[in-house]
């Protein structure tokens, strides 16, 4: 199978072809996803909650991300693999480069970092040194203590304009992908249309170029609070492979996320 690349996603955006992505943390699920044609995966710091059992993503280390990245890469050798740089792993551009090198050596094709215009120098430095960057705006879980919880971001003119400005700044600095989390559909549409790079949404309506879900949310195995934007595809199909195929099909057709999964 031909490898999926950043250029593949760029072509999807140009062709207005929606695409599905998912988090993965181990060999077995990565192989299953790849076998079903789901070829864009993220080793997310969400593993702190879903795999390690913490109440936030903050305890996750670069070593944790590298370990899981290597496992996922073995299961899905041809996927486009993103890896999060966890909390405090990119406080300076130099630190970001050192930690990005670690996860790239483990098998990542691209690193994802959370934050807006303050990251411009970091994004430039990484991009100039052949480390592709995915930005992450909106609800950025590493900032949970600043936000005072997991809340929708970008409501109101000032907040929405700031997020659009952040998105444009990240793109100008060299970011090649952007994740938008928990923002109003109207803002997600503005940002997706304003950027030349692909935008992946989670809790951002069906107006973005792609969608991502935490694997555990997509299969209904999350303990505790279930996000509004989540859908349990396993409950509808009763078979995990069929659930993966249904998730992909609903994203590609624009059925998921529906109005009931979206914010305004």
From Swiss-Prot:
**Cofactor binding description:** Binds 1 Mg(2+) ion per subunit.
Can you tell me which residues bind 3-methyl-2-oxobutanoate? Answer: 45-46, 84, 112
Q: In which pathway does it act?
A: Cofactor biosynthesis; (R)-pantothenate biosynthesis; (R)-pantoate from 3-methyl-2-oxobutanoate: step 1/2
Q: What GO molecular-function term can you cite, just one? A: magnesium ion binding
**So what EC number does this one have?**
2.1.2.11
Top-level taxon of origin:
Bacteria
Chief subcellular location: cytoplasm
The residues that the entry says bind Mg(2+) are 45, 84, 114
Going by the UniProt record, its keywords in alphabetical order are: Cytoplasm, Magnesium, Metal-binding, Pantothenate biosynthesis, Transferase
Q: What sort of enzyme, by top EC class, is this?
A: transferase
| Active-site feature positions | 181
- Look up the record and give one Gene Ontology term from the biological process aspect: pantothenate biosynthetic process
Q: Where in the cell is it found?
A: Cytoplasm
Q: Which Gene3D superfamilies match?
A: Phosphoenolpyruvate-binding domains
Q: Which cofactor does it need?
A: Mg(2+)
What is the reaction catalyzed? 3-methyl-2-oxobutanoate + (6R)-5,10-methylene-5,6,7,8-tetrahydrofolate + H2O = 2-dehydropantoate + (6S)-5,6,7,8-tetrahydrofolate
Supply the CDD domains for this chain.
KPHMT-like
GO CC term (a single one) = cytoplasm
Q: How does it assemble?
A: Homodecamer; pentamer of dimers.
- NCBIfam families assigned to the protein according to its UniProt record, in alphabetical order: panB, PRK00311.1
Which family would the database say this protein is a member of?
Belongs to the PanB family.
Q: What does this protein do?
A: Catalyzes the reversible reaction in which hydroxymethyl group from 5,10-methylenetetrahydrofolate is transferred onto alpha-ketoisovalerate to form ketopantoate.
- Name of protein: 3-methyl-2-oxobutanoate hydroxymethyltransferase
